[in-house]
Curated annotation (Swiss-Prot):
<dbReference type="InterPro" id="IPR009068">
    <property type="entry name" value="uS15_NS1_RNA-bd_sf"/>
</dbReference>
<keyword id="KW-0694">RNA-binding</keyword>
<comment type="subunit">
    <text>Part of the 30S ribosomal subunit. Forms a bridge to the 50S subunit in the 70S ribosome, contacting the 23S rRNA.</text>
</comment>
<feature type="region of interest" description="Disordered">
    <location>
        <begin position="1"/>
        <end position="24"/>
    </location>
</feature>
<keyword id="KW-0699">rRNA-binding</keyword>
<dbReference type="GO" id="GO:0019843">
    <property type="term" value="F:rRNA binding"/>
</dbReference>
<feature type="compositionally biased region" description="Basic and acidic residues">
    <location>
        <begin position="1"/>
        <end position="21"/>
    </location>
</feature>
<keyword id="KW-0689">Ribosomal protein</keyword>
<dbReference type="InterPro" id="IPR000589">
    <property type="entry name" value="Ribosomal_uS15"/>
</dbReference>
<dbReference type="GO" id="GO:0006412">
    <property type="term" value="P:translation"/>
</dbReference>
<dbReference type="InterPro" id="IPR005290">
    <property type="entry name" value="Ribosomal_uS15_bac-type"/>
</dbReference>
<dbReference type="Pfam" id="PF00312">
    <property type="entry name" value="Ribosomal_S15"/>
</dbReference>
<comment type="similarity">
    <text>Belongs to the universal ribosomal protein uS15 family.</text>
</comment>
<keyword id="KW-0687">Ribonucleoprotein</keyword>
<dbReference type="GO" id="GO:0003735">
    <property type="term" value="F:structural constituent of ribosome"/>
</dbReference>
<protein>
    <recommendedName>
        <fullName>Small ribosomal subunit protein uS15</fullName>
    </recommendedName>
</protein>
<comment type="function">
    <text>Forms an intersubunit bridge (bridge B4) with the 23S rRNA of the 50S subunit in the ribosome.</text>
</comment>
């Protein structure tokens, strides 16, 4: 499952530091969070989709790595992002 181009553009505008920002950790984590939420909804109706579940776990691991990187580089930005996305940690 992927997110629409409009959804991705909205996330980039909301979490980006400047116009066209696609590479900052905040934007990457926000896009991954959106994809994870979409897949989570998918698995509520498709419980036996184990191949897709593996992809979900890879996305969660990638998001975790990016969050760890951001925490090591700038604790304040990390805390701000966690609060804005509503992630627990």
């Amino acid at each position: 499952m992927s997110i629409t181009t409009e959804e991705k553009a909205r996330v980039m505008k909301e979490y980006g530091t400047k116009d066209g920002d696609t590479g900052s950790p905040e934007v990457q984590v926000a896009i991954l969070s959106s994809r994870i939420a979409t897949l989570t909804e998918h698995f509520k109706t498709h419980k036996k989709d184990n191949h897709g579940r593996r992809g979900l776990l890879k996305l969660v691991a990638q998001r975790r790595k990016l969050l760890d990187y951001l925490k090591a580089k700038d604790e304040a930005r990390y805390q701000s992002l966690i609060e804005r996305l509503g992630l627990r940690r």
